[in-house]
Amino acid sequence: EEPKPIAKIASGGELSRIMLALKNVIAEKDSIGTLIFDEIDTGVSGRAAQKIGIKLKQISRLRQVLCVTHLAQMAVMADNHLLIEKNIQGDRTVTTVRTLDHEQRKYEIARIMGGENITELMLENAEQYLKDADNM
């Protein structure tokens, strides 16, 4: 098959990961102060998500990184965790953004990993996950 432009054959997630790889290589020379990645982890395994999270953490040492994710492997790597929620109020959709403290963050990581019924074991796992990420 004839080669085609990457923009025509790659998925949104693949394009995001290609961008991540490029940004990781040129971050020191890049004049962009903030990098935004929207669900860069779509369609990847937990292990791949962890590797992406580590790369984003490395980039964040030089640049501000904003990343939307639905995976705990990515969320635990953040220095700051913002929770974005959409709610219906009457006939309107209202979006709220709030910064999570450590306990709220632990709960959110547990929720991402296991759903709405959070157990003490899930919270312990989330706490350990956060500690492990701090050491990476």
Spans of features found by a protein language model:
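Metal-dependent catalytic core segments for phosphate chemistry
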Residues: G12
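Walker B catalytic acidic pair
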Residues: D38-E39
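Conserved helix-loop functional segments at active or binding sites
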Residues: N24-E28, G46, Q58
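C-terminal lobe/lid and adjacent interdomain/linker elements of RecA-like ASCE P-loop ATPase modules
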Residues: R47-M136
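Conserved D-loop-proximal element of ABC-family nucleotide-binding domains
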Residues: K29-D30, T42-Q50
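GG-anchored amphipathic helix commonly corresponding to the ABC/SMC/Rad50 NBD signature/C-loop
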Residues: P5, L15-L35
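Short pre-catalytic strand/loop immediately N-terminal to key active-site residues, enriched for Gly-Thr
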Residues: P3-I9
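Short, glycine-/Ser/Thr-/acidic-enriched flexible segments
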Residues: V25, T42, Q89
